[in-house]
């Protein structure tokens, strides 16, 4: 009889452990992210470690909800394929307008996290020359310069991809390209916050076409969690913690 009771106890403990493991496993989600170095304050990927303001905000949400987010970094084109193929649970950053033709048929839900602005960086001596001064336009590998696609189709602009933001800056500064279509805040952050340079070797030209929007987190697999993230970002009780994270990265939404 004692042996039977022990066996029953072990069975109950085993079931409880399995149930706890299953529950814990259900709370782990993969977020596909881009593998850019020097993309701060938004993100930075180096030595297989993904960091930055975007991750800190998402981890703050996850901790509050009892989730665990696992970040998997890929080049943008591969990230698109994995995300749209359902190989990762979420994508960050995402945006309803990005690769919209590839998203047809997918009911993707989005929650906005951080403002961004993409525009053209030029050498200070070329500031104000207008679109006519852009013949060779660089961009990060995997980017789509939506504001310039018509000019590219007309043959007025030739695109050059670079896997490195630092490589783009060098190409602009050396005159190998006329401008670089990139995230404006990222460029300012690198030169001012990391390099400590006030007289920037590459500058944003506001007279050229540019785009402003939000970096969203997107998913078609877990739309309920997207709703939770959206509510989290709007909840006044979370505002102080989120603003503190932004201050730690010197992230000014009006910059």
What is the predicted function of each stretch?
Residues 18-25:
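Sec/Tat signal peptide C-region and signal peptidase I cleavage site
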Residues 25-102, 158-161, 248:
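Extracytoplasmic small-molecule ligand-binding "clamshell" domains
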Residues 63-72, 151-163, 176-177, 199-202:
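A local structural motif
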């Amino acid at each position: 009889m004692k042996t039977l009771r022990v066996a029953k106890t072990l069975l109950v403990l085993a079931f409880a452990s399995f149930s706890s493991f299953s529950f814990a496993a259900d709370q782990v989600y993969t977020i596909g992210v881009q593998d850019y170095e020097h993309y701060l304050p938004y993100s930075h990927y180096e030595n297989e470690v993904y960091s930055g303001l975007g991750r800190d905000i998402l981890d703050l949400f996850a901790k509050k909800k009892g989730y665990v987010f696992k970040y998997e970094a890929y080049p943008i084109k591969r990230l698109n394929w994995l995300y749209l193929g359902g190989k990762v649970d979420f994508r960050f950053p995402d945006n309803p307008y990005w690769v919209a033709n590839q998203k047809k048929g997918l009911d993707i839900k989005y929650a906005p996290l951080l403002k961004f602005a993409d525009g053209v960086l030029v050498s200070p001596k070329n500031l104000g020359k207008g679109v006519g001064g852009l013949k060779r336009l660089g961009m990060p590998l995997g980017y789509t310069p939506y504001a310039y696609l018509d000019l590219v189709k007309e043959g007025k602009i030739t695109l050059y991809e670079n896997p490195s933001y630092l490589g783009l800056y060098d190409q602009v500064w050396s005159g190998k390209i006329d401008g670089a279509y990139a995230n404006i805040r990222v460029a300012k952050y690198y030169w001012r916050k990391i390099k400590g340079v006030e007289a920037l070797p590459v500058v944003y030209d506001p007279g050229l076409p540019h785009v402003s929007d939000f970096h969203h987190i997107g998913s078609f697999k877990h739309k309920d969690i997207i709703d939770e993230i959206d509510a989290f970002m709007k909840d006044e009780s979370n505002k102080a913690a989120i603003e503190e994270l932004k201050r730690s990265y010197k992230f000014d939404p009006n910059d």
